[in-house]
Regions:
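A glycine-rich helix N-cap at a beta->alpha junction
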Residues: 71-88
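Short acidic-hydrophobic, aromatic-tinged amphipathic segments that line or gate anion-handling sites
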Residues: 2-8
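N-terminal catalytic cores of NTP/NDP-binding nucleotidyl/phosphoryl-transfer enzymes
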Residues: 9-71
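Glycine-rich, highly charged phosphate/nucleotide-binding loops
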Residues: 66-75, 97-105
């Protein structure tokens, strides 16, 4: 997978792309990514994933403190295990947030060579996110860009989402969170001194201070690793 930034966008081949925050890169995201890969392969196009270098809400609300399932480096690591060929890292700015959906689509088409844009079932973009898939399809016809939409990945009657996984982690249900993620939730950090609880449990424990301050911590407890 090749990482693409603003300076290298001009070198992108014609592609099928999807766009989003992809927090957690969970099974719902993996399902979407697999479809992008298959559509691109069938059409003889490259496959591309476009994501943001920071959470959009952080830019629009400076007081907002996200609780992320994956920081940017972890997301990229997950993407590298997918069949996607290109990953565009797009800085989210206030100027970008003011673009209409049509103008944003024009930029994707002209700057990033997006020929087909494949979006999630609940994905919205453009200023105030006031438009939906029908409007995107109309703009796509005007711009010469095909629009496609994925269905939700449903398990036990529930759509797999980042919000659902956060709820599981905050409730301490790591098993269910991992099932929705498709891999084991993990933290990267350094070991710090704690309350020496391990001495009373009969087995060693370690207190981890996450390297990513925005990383979501599961419910308080002692977890096996």
């Amino acid at each position: 997978m090749k990482i693409v930034t603003g300076s290298t966008a001009a070198n992108l081949p014609a592609c099928v792309a999807t766009i989003g925050c992809f927090d957690g890169v969970h099974r719902g995201h993996q399902y979407l990514i697999e479809q992008v890969h298959n559509i691109a392969k069938a059409g003889g196009l490259a496959s591309c994933l476009i994501t943001f270098t920071s959470h959009p809400r952080q830019v629009l609300d400076t007081d907002y403190r996200p609780r992320l399932l994956t920081c940017l480096s972890q997301k990229i690591e997950c993407f590298e295990h997918s069949p996607i060929e290109y990953c565009v890292l797009l800085p989210f700015t206030k100027e970008l947030s003011l673009l209409s959906a049509r103008e944003f689509m024009r930029i994707l088409h002209e700057m990033y060579n997006v020929q087909t844009l494949f979006v999630g079932y609940d994905h919205h973009f453009g200023h105030n996110q006031g438009e939906g898939f029908e409007e995107y399809c109309q703009y796509g016809k005007e711009l010469g860009m095909r629009m496609m939409q994925s269905r939700a990945l449903v398990e036990d009657g529930t759509s797999i989402s980042s919000t659902l996984i956060r709820s599981c982690l905050l409730a301490g249900d790591i098993k269910k969170a991992n099932a929705y993620l498709g891999y084991s939730y993990y933290l990267s950090g350094r070991v710090v001194d704690g309350k020496k609880v391990g001495r009373t449990l009969g087995f060693p424990t370690a207190n981890i201070q996450p390297l990513c301050a925005e990383k979501l911590l599961p419910a308080t407890g002692v977890y096996a690793v």
